């Protein structure tokens, strides 16, 4: 038998394997295109990103439940102690930060790696509506948990309404339920602690025994709160349900 008549099975196997891979890729990307159209993405960039990421598979709970979560890039989750800058030092920097997309936000977020107070101030200054627009597609992996840790750790008196607005905006972002299901134990506890703080601030007044004007201040505060108490309580209850902290 001549060499030209010999069948090269190895070569045929490689060609068949390549053809199968190309067919799978076509089917996968085609399905991703229809999925992107059904989601009514806002831009071609989002459409392209969904198609390019079509080969990625979502994590199963079994993939993450067996081992502790390690986030060396997240000093708050690791309970790292460091000195926060004062508001006077932070404010000039925050005035220059106006991210309009998720990529711009992440870039600016990483610049504030030295102090959680700076990140807290950034979240509060942007507000829930802006954050909802920035993360309309989804919040980056790990960011939601970091947001909750920072908001719980750095919550300041007087910021309760604005923080509630931030939580409301984040709850309306894309794939929120998926990001919520990926929270670590520490992040879930921080979320519960944050809602407890907000509920206490909305419904209680804590007087100082040595302050002679305490009763007047508390009475004025309670009078002001009575007008908005129902709305605030309802909003917090709805948000607690979305974040899974409602008992």
Swiss-Prot record:
Q: What induces it?
A: Expression is regulated by foxj1.
Q: Which residues form a coiled coil?
A: 12-32
The record's GO CC annotations read: axoneme; cytoplasm; extracellular region; motile cilium; outer dynein arm
Name the protein family. Answer: Belongs to the DNAAF19/PR46b family.
The protein's assembly and partners: Homodimer.
Q: What does this protein do?
A: Dynein-attachment factor required for cilia motility.
Q: What is this protein called?
A: Dynein axonemal assembly factor 19
Q: Which gene encodes it?
A: dnaaf19
